[in-house]
């Protein structure tokens, strides 16, 4: 049986890895996040970092849980006005899915393709920063639509543990169990192969060894 393994996202990991975002060479960066990320200052800090590297920035902070068609449309309208050469998703799965869907549709509309897309996750568990999927909700029809396209895969992901150090212990535990579940699902998948097994086994082992420590002490960077 033929299989394939593709990982096209450039992943930056470790403390201070977010600082590498300055080297993306962006001139106009469009930051997508939820209201809390702007209120707590995370979005502003990211914007300042990009400004220091010579980029103009705009923050779209209207992301909601289970992102809706309406929110995606608003994000696209903001892109039309700002004309970014890069989109930065800051937050959890909802922010990343909003950025993926909006960026892809914006690129299709302008005829020039999607701008560079980078993900800066502030929680673990979804893995949306490296997948070709996005889920968007239709509030009127009370339905969810799963989008799948290779163009939805972010170009870069910044996994900086400093962004998760202040997450409440209960959230750390919940998202850690998400990681464990995804690892187990991948391992028993009918489409599993040697490459995916290696990733799944490592994920399971890391959760087993370190989740409790992370829950007890969010500042433990190991």
PLM region spans:
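ATP/NTP phosphate-donor binding region
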Residues: 1-86
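A short, small-residue-rich loop immediately preceding and capping a beta-strand
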Residues: 79-122
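Short glycine/serine/threonine-rich phosphate/pyrophosphate-binding segments
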Residues: 15, 39-42, 69, 94-101, ...
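Predominant activation on well-ordered alpha-helical scaffold segments within soluble catalytic domains
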Residues: 22, 47, 58, 73-76, ...
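Active-site segments that bind and position negatively charged phosphate/pyrophosphate groups
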Residues: 190-222
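Short, hinge-like loop/turn segments at secondary-structure boundaries
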Residues: 48, 76-78, 105-106, 134-138
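A glycine/threonine-rich phosphate-anchoring loop and its flanking beta-alpha core
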Residues: 107-195, 203
């Amino acid at each position: 049986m033929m299989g394939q393994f593709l990982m096209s996202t450039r992943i930056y990991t470790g403390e201070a890895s977010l600082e590498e975002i300055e080297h993306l060479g962006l001139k106009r960066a469009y930051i997508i996040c939820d209201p809390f990320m702007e209120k707590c200052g995370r979005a502003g800090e990211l914007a300042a970092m990009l400004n220091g590297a010579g980029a103009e920035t705009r923050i779209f902070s209207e992301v909601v849980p289970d992102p809706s068609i309406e929110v995606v449309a608003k994000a696209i309208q903001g892109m039309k006005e700002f004309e970014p050469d890069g989109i930065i998703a800051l937050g959890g799965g909802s922010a990343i899915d909003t950025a993926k869907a909006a960026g892809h549709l914006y690129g299709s509309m302008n005829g020039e393709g999607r701008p560079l897309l980078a993900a800066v996750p502030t929680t673990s568990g979804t893995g949306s920063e490296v997948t070709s999927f996005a889920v968007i909700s239709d509030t009127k029809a009370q339905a969810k639509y799963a989008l799948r396209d290779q163009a939805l895969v972010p170009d870069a992901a910044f996994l900086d543990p400093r962004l998760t150090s202040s997450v409440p212990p209960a959230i750390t535990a919940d998202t850690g169990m998400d990681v464990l579940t995804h690892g187990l699902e991948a391992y028993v998948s009918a489409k599993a192969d040697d490459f995916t097994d290696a990733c799944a086994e490592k994920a399971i082992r890391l959760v087993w060894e370190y989740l409790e420590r992370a829950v007890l002490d969010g500042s433990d960077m190991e």
